């Protein structure tokens, strides 16, 4: 289950960025970002993910775009940017 500080579907930033904790249910095909094919875009390979955020687990990590909250590594949002390296 999601941690208490997980980004919720009704979060204003989540709505603005089209965030979905399940990338397969997101708008990543219609709103795809450059760098990888849409089906390969998810939070785990995004430069904004913060693996060492407080409360992070294997499935839930921090994100620079959602301070103090956790995102699902299998999620996607419209700010997805391929992590360097």
Swiss-Prot record:
Recorded GO MF terms: 4 iron, 4 sulfur cluster binding; electron transfer activity; metal ion binding
InterPro entries: High_potential_FeS_prot, HIPIP_sf
Domain of life: Bacteria
TM ranges: none
GO biological process, one term: aerobic electron transport chain
Coiled-coil zones: none
Cellular component GO terms, alphabetical: periplasmic space
Location in or out of the cell: Periplasm
UniProt binding sites for [4Fe-4S] cluster: 43, 46, 63, 77
Keywords on record: 4Fe-4S, Electron transport, Iron, Iron-sulfur, Metal-binding, Periplasm, Transport
Pfam family, any one: HIPIP
Primary subcellular site in the record, as a coarse category: periplasm
PROSITE patterns attached to this UniProt entry: HIPIP (PS51373)
Functional note: Specific class of high-redox-potential 4Fe-4S ferredoxins. Functions in anaerobic electron transport in most purple and in some other photosynthetic bacteria and in at least one genus (Paracoccus) of halophilic, denitrifying bacteria.
Family from the record: Belongs to the high-potential iron-sulfur protein (HiPIP) family.
Assembly and binders: Homodimer.
Protein name (database record): High-potential iron-sulfur protein
Species, as recorded: Allochromatium warmingii (Chromatium warmingii)
């Amino acid at each position: 289950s999601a941690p208490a500080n997980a980004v919720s579907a009704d979060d204003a930033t989540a709505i603005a960025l089209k965030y979905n904790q399940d990338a397969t249910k997101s708008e990543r095909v219609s709103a795809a970002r450059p760098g990888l094919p849409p089906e390969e875009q998810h939070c785990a390979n995004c430069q904004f993910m913060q693996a060492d955020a407080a409360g992070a687990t294997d499935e839930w990590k921090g994100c620079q775009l959602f301070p103090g909250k956790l995102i699902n590594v299998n999620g996607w949002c419209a700010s997805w940017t391929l992590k360097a390296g």
